[in-house]
Amino acid sequence: MARTKQTARKSTGGKAPRKQLATKAARKSAPATGGVKKPHRYRPGTVTLREIRRYQKSTELLIRKLPFQRLVREIAQDFKTDLRFQSSAVMALQEASEAYLVGLFEDTNLCAIHAKRVTIMPKDIQLARRIRGERA
């Protein structure tokens, strides 16, 4: 076959690497050589929602037993010294306290949602207690 002369044509954006790609490749290779890999972080709110679902499923007590027991003894000290408690009495107090707090936080969350917010504030707790009739 006979050789023919090539005519010049415009390039249609061939395969030449662009500068942006070169810098991206350099950025990717830099941490592999000497940098420290960042730890994985979940987006804000993801872990919170996971914890909410986990604690709503569970039935175990959320406050540690010994700190709660110390608090009960400290409060009881104001009324009478040298009081003794059965372990079942402390457990009953803890069950009742946690049930009360969970209910209060549910009502507090409803107050915050009513105010078109997702963050609970002290004024929400005050409103919830006032509606319940616990505080004038």
UniProtKB/Swiss-Prot annotation:
One of its GO terms (molecular function) is protein heterodimerization activity. The modification Allysine is found at residue 5. Residues 1-45 are annotated as: Disordered. InterPro entries: Histone-fold, Histone_H2A/H2B/H3, Histone_H3/CENP-A. The modification N6-(2-hydroxyisobutyryl)lysine is found at residues 5, 10, 15, 19, 24, 28, 37, 57, 65, 80, 123. The modification N6-crotonyllysine is found at residues 5, 10, 19, 24, 28, 57. The modification Citrulline is found at residues 3, 9, 18, 27. This is Histone H3.2.
